[in-house]
């Protein structure tokens, strides 16, 4: 059973605008300047606006994540020999596709999301800037929605807090604004492939060290839930997953 201590879901209004002066310019340039509460409301609106698209992405991610990490186990990437009995936290898990992927590999997995939908048995409500679990709860953490980060330093500290010493954070980065990867939900301190050095430096400052990485190229077909002729019906994905170990 995963230990849980529910934390405050939102900061006080006076703390909404958080400092970014110590971050790379590349991690300060994207997303609208908005308050934290406005950011949360924006992120929560996506499922209601695009339910079929979100479901399709969730199913596709489930299969992609399972393939990716089954291959990582086979290679022994970062010393990962298997997920049997290991605890995994999926950050920004949408409807739980990646949670189910890790469960299928033997993990004890759970996800958090600002809008997990109703009756979700795999994902609970939670903000990855204020993770609702106790310190040192998880062997591994995973996220593929780093383009939705509002405050990278706060995010990194929270991941470091809940991952056990010596545990791993699997951080998947995708192409960013320079190649059309940004969208209306790209957040204030979004991290993409463009930002790899700055992202790794920020996570290092939060207590992680980079130990390995994998790169895959894979298409995601969303034509069934997109308007006919839509230019982005096929997502040509270049995915860099950085393996970051929490220092003891």
Residue ranges and their predicted role:
Residues 206-208, 214-248:
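Core SAM-dependent methyltransferase catalytic element
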Residues 139-152:
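A short SAM/SAH-binding and catalytic strip from SAM-dependent methyltransferases
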Residues 19-80:
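Class I SAM-dependent methyltransferase Rossmann-like catalytic core
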Residues 153-168:
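A short glycine-rich, Lys/Arg-flanked "PGG" loop and its adjoining helix->strand segment in the class I
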Residues 87-130:
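Class I SAM-dependent methyltransferase SAM/SAH-binding core
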Residues 81-86:
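Short helix-loop-beta connector
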Residues 129-141:
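A short acidic, Gly/Pro-enriched loop at the edge of an enzyme's catalytic core
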Residues 170-202:
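Conserved class I S-adenosyl-L-methionine
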């Amino acid at each position: 059973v995963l230990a849980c201590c529910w934390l405050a879901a939102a900061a006080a209004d006076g703390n909404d605008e958080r400092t970014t002066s110590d971050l790379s310019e590349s991690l300060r340039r994207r997303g609208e300047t908005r308050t934290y509460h406005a950011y949360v409301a924006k992120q929560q609106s996506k499922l209601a606006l695009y339910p079929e698209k979100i479901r399709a992405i969730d199913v596709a991610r489930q299969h992609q994540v399972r393939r990716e990490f089954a291959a990582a186990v086979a290679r022994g990437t970062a010393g990962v020999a298997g997920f049997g009995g290991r605890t995994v936290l999926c950050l920004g898990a949408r409807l739980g596709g990646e949670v189910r992927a890790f469960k299928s590999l033997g993990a004890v997995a759970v996800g958090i999301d600002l809008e997990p939908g109703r009756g979700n048995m795999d994902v609970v409500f939670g903000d990855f800037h204020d993770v609702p679990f106790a310190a040192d709860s998880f062997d591994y953490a995973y996220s593929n929605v780093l383009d939705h980060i509002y405050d990278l330093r706060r995010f990194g500290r929270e991941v470091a807090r809940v991952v056990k010493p010596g545990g791993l954070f699997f951080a998947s980065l995708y192409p960013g604004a320079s190649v059309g990867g940004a969208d209306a939900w790209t957040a204030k301190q979004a991290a993409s492939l463009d930002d790899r050095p700055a992202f790794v430096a920020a996570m290092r400052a939060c207590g992680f060290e980079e130990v390995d990485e994998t790169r895959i190229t894979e298409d995601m077909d969303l034509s069934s839930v997109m308007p006919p002729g839509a230019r982005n019906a096929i997502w040509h994905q270049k995915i860099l997953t950085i393996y970051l170990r929490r220092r003891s």
